[in-house]
Amino acid sequence: MISDIQIMVALFAALFTGILALRLGTELYK
């Protein structure tokens, strides 16, 4: 059974990696 804390951590991790990938993509695009 997945707890709410694990879901929140997973969401924050996905959001963090998404922002990181977006910044890296824009840097490489330049």
Curated annotation (Swiss-Prot):
Source species: Mesostigma viride (Green alga)
InterPro entries: PSI_PsaM, PSI_PsaM_sf
GO annotations of cellular component type: chloroplast thylakoid membrane; photosystem I
HAMAP family found in the cross-reference section: PSI_PsaM
Pfam families, per database record: PsaM
Main localisation: plastid
KW Ribonucleoprotein (keyword) present: no
Coiled-coil ranges per UniProt: none
Keyword Transit peptide attributed: no
Membrane topology (UniProt): Single-pass membrane protein
One example of a Gene Ontology biological process annotation: photosynthesis
UniProt-annotated location(s): Plastid, Chloroplast thylakoid membrane
Record field: transmembrane: 7-26
Keywords from the named record: Chloroplast, Membrane, Photosynthesis, Photosystem I, Plastid, Thylakoid, Transmembrane, Transmembrane helix
Record-given protein name: Photosystem I reaction center subunit XII
Family membership noted in the UniProt record: Belongs to the PsaM family.
